[in-house]
């Protein structure tokens, strides 16, 4: 006992607090995973076999599509931000944790206090997130760097993200999402079953940002205080003078849209007619014993046409697919026009700074660029918008083109005033590698650091998680 007292005295206050925290967490874990959340999806594979097996089939979307390689302009549009390093098309829920670990955007942290990203980057990736919030509170969960959560957030998006523990009953598992629904006058506990089916998806398939206020630094918040349209959120961000980053070329205080699928779905024909996300992406199907269940392989409705589209539409699959492809082509065309204007605007703004433009002269120009790119990003980041709300997508992209053009007209006038009358040269950005090189990005170094991280750090995270989960009852 005396020896123990001496050891205690030698421990610093910081190390003692850390030891106490670890001990407390293991004591809690020894009781059960969490009172409200069982993060281990495999626990439910027998009780809810059909749902579990179909959920597991989301692993079949194993192909990785490099969005930057497919559209190198994105590198320039996101210059100075993590997405210029690496951005792949989204895959199935089974890959949520894997992909956020592997992306260059999360860096190659050497320890829990290292790396470029905050803890909030885990927030939509795993049922371990609500578990941690229940154990630590939001203040404890959001505090610190992304790497802090590495050994804790290991179970991919699954059962407890959307369901109450051990039951099919739907729930919102993130307090920040619950607050957001209340903000727009649709509290989850008062919603219909049909609305709840979309609201659980709206925990993550939404626009959000990380707060910068001292008392809530790094907290996730949905910018819905003034409404959920692109203009209302833009006005909200402007009012609080928020920006995600400063553009490396134009020095514009930029906004990065996330994936506002819920907001755009609400504005489309399906949302307005009470057709939920589940109706189209998780339909009722019949197993080999003739029993119906909800298919949890979230995917393209056309892959299960008879159980999805055909329950409402009398037209053929070929007809509806044709219409959707036409709409997608129109959205893609306007998207490209907006990108072309924005890329030139960023380079022209960089030139204006170079030849002596003042902040006062640049402010209205940067506002136009900020608003144009926000609107472009909002439309394209809303995956499936060509099916959900094509008219809204085209409207938003049209305003993006207009605002980018406005910025370029002002830039032409300002550049002429500064003596620049020739067109501003745009470097070769025809490939992802050339675009990244034009920005001076050392991709070899970033990739090497990431590979070392995957080799040296990830196995340690998994081993720590395995030991912790072994104490669960």
From Swiss-Prot:
Heme binds at residues 121, 124-125. Binds 1 Ca(2+) ion per monomer. Binds 5 heme c groups covalently per monomer. Substrate binds at residues 208, 259. This is Cytochrome c-552. It is an enzyme of class 1 (oxidoreductase). Heme c 5 binds at residues 270, 309, 312-313. GO terms for cellular component: outer membrane-bounded periplasmic space. Pfam families: Cytochrom_C552. One of its GO terms (biological process) is anaerobic electron transport chain. Pathway: Nitrogen metabolism; nitrate reduction (assimilation). Heme c 2 binds at residues 159, 162-163, 296. Keywords: Calcium, Electron transport, Heme, Iron, Metal-binding, Oxidoreductase, Periplasm, Signal, Transport. Catalyzes the reduction of nitrite to ammonia, consuming six electrons in the process.
């Amino acid at each position: 006992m005396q020896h123990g007292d001496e050891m205690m005295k030698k421990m610093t206050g910081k190390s003692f607090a850390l030891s106490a925290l670890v001990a407390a967490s293991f004591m809690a874990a020894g009781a059960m995973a969490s009172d409200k959340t069982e993060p281990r999806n495999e626990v439910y594979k027998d009780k809810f076999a059909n749902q579990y097996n179909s959920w597991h089939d989301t692993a079949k979307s194993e192909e990785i599509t490099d969005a930057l390689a497919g559209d190198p302009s994105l590198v320039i549009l996101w210059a100075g931000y993590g997405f210029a390093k690496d951005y792949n098309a989204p895959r199935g829920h089974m890959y949520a944790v894997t992909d956020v670990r592997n992306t260059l955007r999360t860096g190659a942290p050497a320890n829990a206090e290292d790396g470029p990203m905050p803890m909030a980057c885990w927030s939509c990736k795993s049922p371990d997130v609500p578990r941690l919030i229940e154990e630590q509170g939001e203040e404890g969960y959001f505090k610190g760097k992304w790497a802090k959560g590495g050994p804790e957030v290991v179970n991919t998006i699954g059962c407890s993200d959307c369901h109450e523990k051990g039951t099919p009953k739907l729930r919102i598992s993130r307090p920040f999402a619950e607050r957001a629904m209340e903000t727009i006058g649709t509290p989850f506990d008062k919603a219909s079953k049909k609305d709840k089916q979309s609201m659980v998806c709206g925990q993550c398939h939404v626009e959000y940002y990380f707060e910068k206020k001292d008392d809530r630094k790094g907290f996730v918040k949905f910018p819905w205080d003034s409404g959920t349209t692109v203009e209302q959120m833009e006005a909200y961000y402007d009012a609080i003078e928020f920006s995600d980053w400063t553009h490396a070329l134009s020095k514009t205080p930029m906004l990065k849209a996330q994936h506002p699928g819920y907001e755009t779905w609400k504005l489309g024909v399906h949302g307005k007619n009470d057709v939920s996300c589940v109706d189209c992406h998780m339909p009722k199907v019949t197993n080999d014993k003739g029993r119906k269940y909800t298919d949890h392989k979230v995917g393209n409705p056309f892959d299960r046409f008879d159980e999805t589209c055909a329950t409402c539409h009398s037209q053929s699959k070929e007809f509806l697919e044709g219409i959707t492809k036409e709409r997608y082509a129109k959205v893609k065309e306007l998207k490209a026009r907006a990108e072309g204007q924005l890329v030139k605007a960023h380079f022209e703004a960089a030139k204006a700074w170079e030849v002596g433009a003042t902040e006062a002269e640049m402010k209205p120009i940067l506002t136009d660029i900020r608003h144009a790119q926000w609107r472009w990003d909002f439309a394209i980041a809303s995956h499936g918008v060509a099916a959900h709300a094509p008219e809204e997508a085209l409207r938003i992209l049209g305003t993006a083109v207009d605002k980018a053009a406005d910025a370029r007209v002002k830039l032409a006038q300002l550049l002429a005033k500064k003596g620049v009358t020739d067109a501003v040269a745009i470097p070769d950005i025809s490939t992802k590698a050339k675009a990244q090189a034009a920005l001076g990005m050392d991709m070899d170094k970033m990739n090497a650091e990431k590979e070392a991280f995957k080799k040296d750090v990830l196995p340690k995270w998994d081993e720590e998680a395995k030991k912790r989960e072994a104490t669960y009852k």
